[in-house]
């Protein structure tokens, strides 16, 4: 049915031929062609009640949305605009962008933080105050967070956000309102999030049905046919976060480096104690204690089970202060720092004080040592992602930075009052090369909504639970024109994943999480393909054989059709002759996968999903006695 969707897109574009390409307030900005296109379609089809902006980080989702909000009154006089956003993003980018380019809509805007404990009450209180003659336009920024907060917990408890989700899914289309969801990573943790998002945008279209069978979509064609026009899809980098990507005129080159570091004996000892503690307390599935142990260890492992919280906190504070005091008035000599900046380690001619300090710091954290050495050897500015703030996280890392003489800012929950200003200083043109501030260390608070410019190296100290979160983290530094001020030879970003290893070769928590991410991505890639093929851009570019229409009366019927995945009519089992192979998507063999090559040259993954055709002259590497094809 994509031809039918194409006809409505064409109709919307014909209705909006005179829509200006510039947005003017106290400042003027000219929209990119893709921004102008999606705005014209969404505004040109008044009965298009909802849309997902699946735009990668840095291409201007916020700007596109503000343009749409500015022109809502082109289609109706009275609007109330409700923006559901994270608290950290209200001022920047949302309020700043609105005040700069569309100040006239500020009186119509209601900002509600969906992280607020009273979110539900605040939302429905505001709904009651809206004039009945007004139409409502709801904006859900980083909608994957909103969806995640609306999922029913494993214990069956319904979360407060779910009532808002239910209200929106029932009311938006019924009352002729509009809604825009924004995300660079619309699916983060589970396939259920896809179902939730689809039913928010197209209520009732996707009932409780199994989307996958043996990790393969049951009926991709049915999904694409029924979900046409669901989203706008602007994703220039469709590669895995673990793949290298060449640079372009607008985007910096990305190179991924896996930095494996062997834990010290002290760290291994504490790591094993952390593992046992997780088993005893029943939290092994979260791996929190082991993750912290791979990052930093004190001289002893503080047991938390069956202890008074105050007593436990006091022990942690004592251990921290002891470590901090051990570094008082100590720092590396200029000679040692010069050695580190050359990318070298201390030699036999180094001072006893430098060698002793380095040894002590490495015993407690090989990861922090590796990061500090990497930062000093970097030619430009750096980012460091460390999800833990206290105990073994950022608080300790900053002590390492002090000893290594690394200037820095912090973006975390501890710096709410100063972090926006600090990032602005970090991004200043005068600091393009990191002369004033070398590094920004950030927690999960900095994973979304902020931009960094002229970054050359990102160090990821802890694996997240999903590739989407990693993509958000890396996307903070690789954005549209983020390196325009950087010298041409430095328009690159090295992404360093720092992975701890055990001396006995057993997999660590870092390697476990890496495998989890790889497993999840198999299903997510297929769902992202559905988003792509149902997007306004894909339909407009690929469906040309349609009959023009002169009204939008049939749009609601077209997008209200239920999706039927109950039949396996489109699944066929075939026996294919060929050979088993090994393949990798990385020249550095970061992940090696089993696959199958048919006699016709088609390559499949281990689950039978077609990947691509075997190249005429494939790149092959030998690793551990295996022939590895590089795709």
UniProtKB/Swiss-Prot annotation:
SUPFAM superfamilies: P-loop containing nucleoside triphosphate hydrolases
Effect ascribed to mutating residue 145 to Q: No effect on ATP hydrolysis
Subcellular location(s) per record: Virion
UniProt xrefs under SMART domains: DEXDc, HELICc
Residues engaged in binding ATP: 55-62
Stored InterPro entries: Helicase_ATP-bd (IPR014001), Helicase_C-like (IPR001650), NPHI_C (IPR013676), P-loop_NTPase (IPR027417), SNF2_N (IPR000330)
Leader sequence residues: none
A GO cellular component entry from the record: virion component
Catalytic activity: a ribonucleoside 5'-triphosphate + H2O = a ribonucleoside 5'-diphosphate + phosphate + H(+)
Effect of residue 62 to A/V: Almost complete loss of ATP hydrolysis
Top-level EC class as recorded in UniProt: hydrolase
CDD domains: SF2_C
Annotated EC: 3.6.1.15
Record keywords, A-Z: ATP-binding, DNA-binding, Hydrolase, Late protein, Nucleotide-binding, Transcription, Virion
Reported impact of residue 476 to A/K: Loss ATP hydrolysis
Annotated phenotype, changing residue 61 to A/R/Q: Almost complete loss of ATP hydrolysis
Annotated motif DEXH box, positions: 141-144
Gene3D superfamilies xref list: P-loop containing nucleotide triphosphate hydrolases
Residue ranges constituting the Helicase C-terminal domain according to the UniProt record: 367-532
Major localization listed first in the record, in broad terms: virion
Physiological role: DNA-dependent ATPase that acts as a 5' to 3' translocase on single-stranded DNA and thereby plays a role in transcription termination of viral early genes. Uses forward translocation in concert with the viral RNA polymerase RAP94/OPG109 subunit and the capping enzyme/VTF to catalyze release of UUUUUNU-containing nascent RNA from the elongation complex. In addition, acts as a positive elongation factor to assist transcription through problematic sequences.
Subunit field text: Monomer. Interacts (via C-terminus) with RAP94/OPG109 (via N-terminus). Interacts with the cap-specific mRNA (nucleoside-2'-O-)-methyltransferase OPG102.
Membership in a protein family: Belongs to the helicase family. NPH I subfamily.
Protein name: Nucleoside triphosphatase I
